[in-house]
Amino acid sequence: SQIELRVLAHLSGDAALIEAFQRGEDIHDRTALGIFGANSGLDRKEMRSRAKMVNYALLYGKTAFTLARDIGVSQQAAQAFIDAYFAGFPGVRVFIDRTLQEARVSGVVKTIFGRRRPVPELNSSNGQLRAATERIAVNMPIQGTAADIMKRAMIDVHQALMAGPAGPAGR
């Protein structure tokens, strides 16, 4: 279902990402075409696999260095993939920047449903701590919202089962 990427589409408002989901496109194929192009020399399966890693790498705040290591390319190539991704989905870059800016001011990030997580280390003078907190600040609204959606769905299913023919006595 790619729920986290769907949540990202909603939160970022990125028109291309939203359109891809509305059309029922495979988002990893769409990303592959955008970052590798039609004549990359890679087969579709390999392109899709790498594009999937790029899609999720950016959700989790990976850098060109870590992405390069994960997909077995040079750091320069990984940076080119990241740049191509943001060129194809510019609303995602805006979302990341806006989320970090708002979190630096408020000290918290939130899910769509209002669940909050403090991120006081965003303004830390310790670069490693600040970078780790930036990854948390960007990821939490996405992953947290996806988790909230799944938890609400489980509650709805449980209530429907309890109200159904088997009901509580069917346990």
Predicted regions and their residues:
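Conserved catalytic core of nucleotide polymerization and phosphodiester-bond processing enzymes
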Residues: S1-R171
